[in-house]
Amino acid sequence: MKKRVLAASVLALVLSGCSSQVSYGDPQEVETVNVDFGSSDLQKIAGEMTESMISSPLLIDITSNNRPIVFVERIKNKTTEHIDTESVTDSISTKLLQSGKFRFVDMSRVNEVRDQLDYQNDGGLVDPSKAIAFGQQVGAEYMLYGNLASIVKTNKKTKDVYYKMTMRLMDLQTGIVEWADETEIRKAETKSTFGW
């Protein structure tokens, strides 16, 4: 009988040690789980690029009496990692919109907008006096685009990852790049006794 109680106790102890725990963390806190691109990197890049663009003397001049309309192209991922560049793009767009200096057109929703306008104008279900007419949208004046690249170096003990984010703002009428900047992140990871 004592053996069964002891075995049950040991089994309960082992199983309780295998259970996972979930907790909330501060999304602004720096996460350093590994050298891969993470949430801290996304926040750093979005913050630095937004601040650089808003504080650029040329863009201060452009936005002093006008809120230019911008089309934001999804950031291109030129790293070897799977990085959700849509999240980076969304964070930058959101911060710029919240600055109150820019307005945006969302090219990712063109088909849905077209479907809605077709429904309103051709379906016969919407009062024609209240339907939004085709050809009333405004076009973008500027295009914001960029890419995220990385260089990875490893040796027996260390893995070093360098990330570089480059962005540009182009005047769509003239083709002139009005603003460009880049920000960098470098991370290093030392190999433990049992591997990466």
Residue ranges of each PLM-predicted region?
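Bacterial N-terminal signal peptides that target proteins for export
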Residues: 1-7
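N-terminal segment of the mature soluble domain
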Residues: 48, 52-125, 174-180
